[in-house]
Amino acid sequence: MKSWVYRILEKEKILSQKNKYSIGILGLAYKENTNSVKNSPTLNLLRKLKNNKITIYDPEAKLKKKIKNCNQINNINFLLKISNVIIVMTPWNEFKKVSKILEKHKKKNIILIDPYRIININIVKNKYIKYFTIGKK
């Protein structure tokens, strides 16, 4: 899954335009309902995104040490407001409300990468949001 996310970022040329995109990552824990980051796919992805500005939100897990290009925040609304690339890395139940928050902010030109299909595609499916999930084009 983590390599799939990275391939989408490469395909959309997000990695090569480091100042154009603000990347928001939803989920740091290795799975939902835990605060453990051991074997977290997010940490592997962060190592590959060291040239990009990253904001992370997780309701339970915290970064154990500071990572140069990363800022962990405790407000999902703020992350969604400042990010134009949003990646779901842990399928927390709380993230199901992301589509409604994005709709409320009326955000445009968003790239939403959701390997777990936790986001309600019927709400986010519009001309302003480019939605990627495993198994759907």
Per-range role (PLM):
Residues 1-137:
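Structural/interface elements that position substrates and couple domains in central-metabolism enzymes
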